[in-house]
């Protein structure tokens, strides 16, 4: 009466779900990485300018 999923079907659905999530949220991850890179560059510039003042 109750139909169960086989291990292969469950594994396929899991992989498909993870791949779909990565595809959907990829722009969010890219924007975060870009923001972090820009912030790191700004911090280096601030530190260099402070070192020059000293």
From Swiss-Prot:
The keyword Chaperone does not apply. This is Protein PIGBOS1. Signal peptide: none annotated. Homooligomer. Interacts (via C-terminus) with endoplasmic reticulum (ER) protein CLCC1; the interaction occurs at the mitochondria-associated ER membrane, a zone of contact between the ER and mitochondrial membranes, but does not appear to play a role in ER-mitochondria tethering and is not affected by ER stress. It is found in: Mitochondrion outer membrane. Plays a role in regulation of the unfolded protein response triggered by endoplasmic reticulum (ER) stress resulting from the presence of unfolded proteins in the ER lumen. Residues 1-4 are mitochondrial intermembrane. GO terms for biological process: regulation of endoplasmic reticulum unfolded protein response; response to unfolded protein. It comes from Homo sapiens. It is a single-pass membrane protein. It holds the Pfam family PIGBOS1. The gene is PIGBOS1.
């Amino acid at each position: 009466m109750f139909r169960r999923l086989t291990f292969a079907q469950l594994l396929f659905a899991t992989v498909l779900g993870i791949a779909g999530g990565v595809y959907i949220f990829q722009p969010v991850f890219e924007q975060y990485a870009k923001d972090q890179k820009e912030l790191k560059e700004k911090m280096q510039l601030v530190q260099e300018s402070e070192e020059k003042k000293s």
